[in-house]
UniProtKB/Swiss-Prot annotation:
Reactions catalysed, as given in the entry: ATP-dependent breakage, passage and rejoining of double-stranded DNA
CDD domains named among the record's database cross-references: HATPase_GyrB-like, TopoII_Trans_DNA_gyrase, TOPRIM_TopoIIA_GyrB
Family per record: Belongs to the type II topoisomerase GyrB family.
A GO cellular component annotation in the UniProt record: chromosome
Protein name: DNA gyrase subunit B
Binding site for Mg(2+) 1: 424, 498
Other remarks in the entry: Few gyrases are as efficient as E.coli at forming negative supercoils. Not all organisms have 2 type II topoisomerases; in organisms with a single type II topoisomerase this enzyme also has to decatenate newly replicated chromosomes.
GO biological process, one term: DNA topological change
Cofactor-binding details, from the entry: Binds two Mg(2+) per subunit. The magnesium ions form salt bridges with both the protein and the DNA. Can also accept other divalent metal cations, such as Mn(2+) or Ca(2+).
UniProt source species: Buchnera aphidicola subsp. Acyrthosiphon pisum (strain APS)
InterPro entries with a match to the protein in the record: DNA_gyrase_B_C (IPR002288), GyrB (IPR011557), GyrB_hook (IPR049353), GyrB_insert (IPR041423), HATPase_C_sf (IPR036890), Ribosomal_Su5_D2-typ_SF (IPR020568), Ribsml_uS5_D2-typ_fold_subgr (IPR014721), Topo_IIA (IPR001241)
Enzyme Commission number(s) from the entry: 5.6.2.2
Length: 803
């Protein structure tokens, strides 16, 4: 067979075909969701460019219920006149021709994020359908595209007094085969960033799938961004370092503040586009800052006694910083703009950071002292850790020659097929060791209380026995000098902890450890969370395992509503009402769950009474509100057999000109208030509750009997009927709630949690590093106030607390 390679093998991809053939070159990964969301950002970036030129004040991004996304701005509107070279409208040129746009002409945009002129045409190429509406020159224009091709020329569909551009697109299922669902959190993160970077713009994000709406309009700019990022940390100095300056046509804006953590968080932007891989602006910032602070430390004599060498990582420990540059002709490493390669940016930033940082340090001596002290302490800790590593080199805790004694290793040598289970305690570790597949499953038991790596310094952390065992077992090392991912011994690192409070605590600590110290393991998808069952059900010889409370709820409903017969009082079967009865009972059960998770929390007795209480529609009439809340309190006082007493209050909301009732529950000298805010009284939850009561009264006001498992019950209230059904469904059923993995024997643990054929595992990913960072700080950091607030907001929703 001849292998001919000649001119016939050379393919020319014209128009937008190149984009469809190699979409990853233009928007990034099309499988993991990043490329999908990048489509939205390409359109938003065009609107931001209008804002940078002073023509746009408002951007509205909408996720529609059919999973399309629209972006609307009030800029000048895309040009609609006929292009002199292409003989079609300029709008059509922009949407169908690669490397076209107004950003190559310096008169239209002095500064822009667009470099290659491919953004919006790429979105068009990778969309099943795209709708374009332009408001310009008192006219409203429209054009529809399918798979990048126009259905018809740009046409006038009406008149308007506004200007702007509206683009709505439906992503192509052929391109985005694995992930076609937009995530609100990812879009929210980017739009929030843009609002901080452009304090003169209001950006709205609406999700029609869930009715969530947000407006991002941060007038404090990047200083407000720093406050947002440091909200759950403890800053070590008061005044945020900030400056804005221009040199050689490059505008630089920097804000930064140190906190008491040990990690750096530096975000880089060029013309509002984020660079996750940094680039020349980050390099200039780092070198300029290290040099400037070293000079200041030397001049002021801060380091006379110890003569510790200060390096870049010492300077950046606990630093939160925003670097935002505006540059006329930015150069990036790729269309996704993840790395800036404009060489001129480095020298400009080095120079400007030197001038402004020295000025800040001299003008703020108190802040300067705290910053320098932190830097010197960081250097001392680093040096101490280095010396400890050198002294213990031969028997280093990181040396793979001596694996931890508690590790039961596997036989497999290829990390791609090797699993390590990080198990809580020796008891569970014993069951896991006996139940595992020795060929490729290793077990490492960890003590109940491992070190809080969020609060601990690096040298203290690596000397902790539990962390040391973990690092040794993984084999990849830790820290800049020791870490090597190629030496990782397992590509499946599975956290397997109990379902109780201690288990959740240890799981959080381990996730903190991986997130802070070995983030690449999470980024590469090597970290998993095992999903052992929470319940075991047994009836006769049959056994069933249930994974979580949600699955248990579904099982309970199904079991409670199975094999029912409805009868009238004279024993006639009336099963025509059975379907409605099951619907009411299911809704009651689910409303209880919804209310527990909702921010509108009320005690069970109040919740159950609301079902039968009439719907409160009118909050403007105080007499109606008074009658409603008075009757509710009166009924509660009659039905509550405890020492609780229910009284009422009515608060006037002057802003809205309405009256909002409050129920006050007193018990001896203590009382708790529950407000019925307008937000709740207009919510879906409240409507569901009152509709449920009305349906029950309508269908079951007559005397109806229910029969199940040979027993009969006279229907009186939803609550009592549901309790009876649950009780009947549990007859002969043994329910065991596992508090610990040690309660399972090896065979059960294998069948439910470790067998690749039957197990469920959660892969740990960090979609939004900033939000994850804040969550870890809230739960694990030293600042008490944010944690207290978190506990107060969530305590009432807590279930299954072990006392």
């Amino acid at each position: 067979m001849k292998n001919i390679y000649d001119s016939s093998n050379i393919k020319i991809l014209r128009g937008l075909d190149a984009v469809r053939k190699r979409p990853g070159m233009y928007i990034g990964d099309t499988d993991d969701g990043s490329g999908l969301h990048h489509m939205v950002f390409e359109i938003v970036d065009n609107s931001i460019d209008e804002a940078l030129s002073g023509y746009c004040k408002e951007i509205i991004v909408t996720i529609h219920s059919d999973n399309s996304v629209s972006v609307k701005d009030d800029g000048r509107g895309i040009p609609t006149d006929i292009h002199p070279e292409e003989n079609i409208s300029a709008a059509e040129v922009i949407l169908t021709v690669l490397h076209s746009g107004g950003k190559f002409d310096n008169a239209s945009y002095q500064i822009s994020g667009g470099l290659h002129g491919v953004g919006i045409s790429v979105v068009n190429a990778l969309s099943e359908k795209l709708e374009l509406i332009i408001d310009k020159n008192k006219k409203k224009y429209q054009q529809i595209y399918r798979h990048g091709k126009p259905e018809n020329p740009l046409s006038i569909i009406g008149t308007t007094d506004t200007t702007g551009t509206y683009i709505r697109f439906w992503p192509s299922y052929k391109t985005f085969t694995n992930n076609i669902k937009f995530q609100y959190e990812i879009l929210s993160k980017r739009l929030r960033e843009l609002s901080f970077l452009n304090s003169n713009i209001a950006i709205y994000l609406e999700d029609n799938r869930t009715s969530i709406k947000n407006c991002y309009h941060y007038k404090g700019g990047i200083k407000a961004f720093i406050k947002f990022l440091n909200a759950k940390k403890t800053p070590i100095h008061t005044h945020i370092f900030y400056f804005r300056s221009t040199k050689d046509q490059i505008e630089l804006e920097i804000a930064m503040q140190w906190n008491n953590s040990h990690q750096e968080n530096i975000l880089c932007f060029t013309n509002n586009i984020p660079q996750k891989d940094g680039g020349t602006h980050l390099a200039g910032f780092r070198s300029g800052m290290t040099r400037t602070l070293n000079l200041h430390i030397e001049r002021e004599g801060y380091n006379k006694k110890n003569k510790t060498t200060i390096i870049g990582e010492d300077v950046r420990e606990g630093l939160t910083a925003i670097i935002s540059i505006k540059i006329p002709d930015p150069k990036f490493s790729s269309q996704t703009k993840d790395k800036l390669v404009s060489s001129e940016a480095r020298s400009v930033i080095e120079s400007l950071i030197n001038e402004n940082l020295i000025e800040y340090l001299l003008e703020n001596p108190s802040d300067s002292k705290f910053i320098i002290q932190k830097i010197i302490n960081a250097a001392k800790v680093r040096e101490a850790a280095r010396r400890a590593r050198e002294i213990n080199k031969k028997k280093s805790i990181l040396d793979l020659g001596a694996l931890p004694g508690k590790l039961s290793d596997c036989q497999e040598n290829d990390p791609k097929f090797s699993e390590i289970y990080l198990v809580e305690g020796d008891s569970a570790g014993g069951s896991a060791k006996q139940g595992r597949n020795r060929k490729n499953q290793a077990i490492l038991p960890l003590k109940g209380k491992i070190l809080n790596v969020e609060k601990s310094k690096f040298d203290k952390m690596i000397l902790s026995q539990e962390v040391a065992s973990l690092i040794t077992a993984l084999g990849c090392g830790i820290g800049k000098n020791e870490y090597n991912i190629d030496k990782l011994r397992y590509h499946y690192i599975i956290i397997m902890t109990d379902a109780d409070v201690d288990g959740a605590h240890i799981r959080t600590l381990l996730l903190t450890f991986f997130y802070r110290q070995l983030p690449e393991l999470i980024e590469k998808g090597y970290v998993y969370i095992a999903q052992p069952p929470l319940y075991k059900l047994k009836k006769g010889r049959k056994e069933k395992y249930i994974k979580n409370d949600e699955e248990m709820n579904t099982y309970q409903i199904k079991n409670a509503l199975k094999d029912l017969v409805l009868k009238s009082e004279d024993n006639l079967i009336i099963n025509q009402k059975l379907k409605k009865f099951k619907k009411i009972m299911s809704e009651y059960h689910y409303i209880q769950i919804i209310m527990k998770q909702s921010k509108h929390y009320f005690p069970k007795l109040v919740f159950n009474e609301l079902i039968y209480h009439n719907h409160l529609h009118n909050l403007k009439d105080i007499e109606i509100v008074k009658e409603w809340i008075y009757t509710l309190a009166e009924n509660l006082n009659k039905k509550d057999n405890s020492n609780n007493h229910y009284s009422i209050e009515i608060k006037e909301n002057l802003d809205k000109n309405i009256f909002e009732p409050t129920i006050k529950i007193s018990r001896y000298a203590h009382y708790t208030k529950y407000d019925f805010k307008e937000e709740f009284l207009k919510s879906k939850e409240y409507l569901l509750i009152t509709n449920l009561g009305e349906s029950f009264k309508k269908y079951f006001s007559d005397k109806v009997l229910i029969e199940k498992s040979g027993s009969t019950y006279k229907i009186d209230s939803i609550k009592n009927t549901w309790k009876w059904l649950i009780k009947q469904s549990k007859r002969g059923l043994f329910i065991q709630r596992y508090k610990g993995l040690g309660e399972m024997n090896p065979e059960q643990l294998w069948n439910t949690t470790m067998n690749p054929e039957t197990r469920n595992m959660l892969q740990v990913t960090i979609k939004d590093a900033v939000s994850a960072n804040n969550l870890f700080n809230t739960l694990m950091g030293e600042a008490v106030e944010p944690r207290r607030q978190f506990i107060e907001n969530n305590a009432l929703k807590a279930e299954n607390i072990d006392v």
